Structures are given as C-alpha cells and as structure tokens.
Amino acid sequence: MIRLAALALAAALALGLVGCDTSSIVPGGSGDVMPNPAASQTGTTPSDGQDAAFQMHFIDVGQALSVLVECDGQFMLYDGGNVDDGSLVVSYLQKQGVEQLQYVFCSHAHEDHVGGLAAVMAKFPAGHAYSSVMEASTKCFNDFVKYTQQQGLQLEVPSVGTVWPLGSATVTLLGPVTQYSETNNTSLVLRIDYGNTSYLLTGDMEKTAETDLVNSGANLKADVLQVGHHGSSTSTSYVFLNAVLPEMGIISCGVNNKYGHPHEETLSILRDAGVDVYRTDLLGTITVSSDGQNYTVATEHFATDAELNPTDPAVSSTAQQAYIGNVNSKKFHLPSCANLPAEKNQILFSSYDEAVAAGYSPCSSCIK
C-alpha cells in the first residue's frame, strides 16, 4: 500500500464534518502546523478525498467511540457513543447522506459504546445488528435491543471469521477469540479491507485479549488502527502493535477526561513504533478517505505535532530510544523487532546504556 502523508482538506464541510476549522498534521515534524501538505513517499499525487469510494469517519463523541464506514454508497456503524451522543451521531449520519445502515455493530456493552445506538436504530433502518453479547443489565443496552427488535430484527452475536461485504470492501470479524469475564475484552474486533488499504477496529480490547488475538494467527496487519480503550495503558501492548504495524493510530477520547486518556505509556509505545497519532480530543472528527491504493486524512481542527505527542523525541531533546529486553535470553530489542519475547518476559529500558548496564546484550537482528 502506498502511504500518504496526512492531507488536510480545505473543503471539510463538503464532507459533512462538524464545525468550520480543518487542518492537516505532519506527525514527527517540527511541531508547526503545516497547512494543506500533500506528499507521497512514492511521488503519487493524492486526491483530496472527496471522490473516494471509501471513507471512515471517527466521529467526535468525546470520551466514547463511534465510527461510520462508507463504501460505494453503503454504510455501517461501529458503536454509537454515550446516550447523550445519540442525537449528535444521528445528525452526523444524516449530513453524510445515510438513509439506511447495512450493519450496526455494538463492540461491547459499555455505555460509552452502546449508548447512542438506540437513537440510531430509532432513526435509520438497518440490515443487521450485531453485538458481542445478547444480554446486559443496563438500560442503554436494553434500549438498543428494543429499537433493534422494533425494526423486526434480532440482535446477533457473530462468529469469528464471519465476512461481510460493504460495497467493494470486506469486513471480517477477528475477535474475541475466546470468552472473557472482563467486558472490555469482549469487544468485537473488525478488520476492514478496501483495495490495498486495511483498517482495524478494536473497541476497548485490552492486553489479555490482544495477546490471544495475536496467538490465534489472525491477519492483524493494518494501515490504520483504532487504538484500543481510548488510549488507555490497559491496551496496546508492544506484542500487539508489532503484529499490526500500523502507519496511523486514531484515538477517540474526550478533552481533559477524568481517566487521563490517552495515557503517556500508550503514546510512548506508539511513538516507539513510528505510528502517526491522531486524537479526537485535539482534532475533532477525523475522516480517512481511500481510493483503494492511497489514503488521505481530514480533521475538524488544527493541532500541532507537539500537542499530539507532548514528549515526542522530535520535539524533546531529552527523549531517548526505548528498548525491550527478554528476561530469559538477556537480549534487548527495538520495539519493531520481529523477535520480541512474550509480553510476560519483557522488560523496558529507556536507553541503550541502561540495557547494557543491566547485563543485557543487543539483538543482532534489529540493532546494528
């Protein structure tokens, strides 16, 4: 897949983005806002996204998640934010020209994911409605079920490996691969493929389920990753990120939220892996558009790289490369190494010298 630098769309209102400010960010740069850059590693001229047959909208629903996916005029929705976000999500879908939804997915039964889906089901006819569970003891989940049934539909729990068409894109259920008592780990994990581009939606999946998913042998490699659990340190392990190898990570979280999301530990891991980070708390609604070969990004607001990555080595002279040690072999690796140990056998070093001082030797494959 040909990777494009993030592209700002001056015509964001034509895409139906909420608000009037649009921007583009060049992650890893000097921290300055770069208006409307359009660069490609291979020299391919990117489109502005308006004519793209595929779009993925990470709707700004604050400390919650809602993702609208469109391909060839067909739509699916992954989560609906909180109950109070229902009218916002409905309005956004209407602005995008949604008249019906092929699929509605509730990643898991927490209110910040299922809450707004009742309002969506009350407004838009759907082909199918899916969830990781059939029952939950919350009013918001039961309201989702009620409005689903009022359409004459039954809520379905899909099986891993199920593949759905969405226009010329395909949507595949990768997880959860086993049963969990922790609700976050029951999140439906979806892989979306469109042409040579790929996208991964993970809900609030945490590290235990990430490890199980990696061990399942599922094809996790994706260009764009919805970073799990709003950027919490309970998600996004080195092992999982090494399997996905995303170019872009999108975090849906609220401004100054009480949980401190995204956590610095997660941002550090993403930096170490060279992932470009986009956050709804700083950028508002984020729209990824693709023609099947390239993808572009539009954001509702401006933000500098220094804001997106407050301790990014590119803007902090004191930051150092992190290394991962193997407590059994006493070797240490770059986070991108293909030979990383299991997470339980990992130890993190903040510098090369620290690892050597601890008695570890560098991996000959990744550290030259």
What is the role of each PLM region?
Residues 8-16:
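Bacterial N-terminal signal peptides
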Residues 288, 320, 353-357:
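Hydrophilic extracytoplasmic domains
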Residues 314-330:
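SH3-family beta-barrel domains
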Residues 1-9:
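Positively charged n-region of N-terminal signal peptides that target proteins for export
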Residues 13, 330, 356-359:
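Residue-level signal for mature regions of secreted extracellular proteins and peptides
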Residues 326-342:
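Short aromatic-glycine-(Arg/Gly/Cys) micro-motifs in beta-strand/loop hairpins
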Residues 2, 17-319, 339, 345, ...:
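Non-globular, low-confidence helical/coil segments that flank catalytic cores
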Residues 337-368:
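Compact, charge-rich alpha-helical regulatory domains located at protein termini
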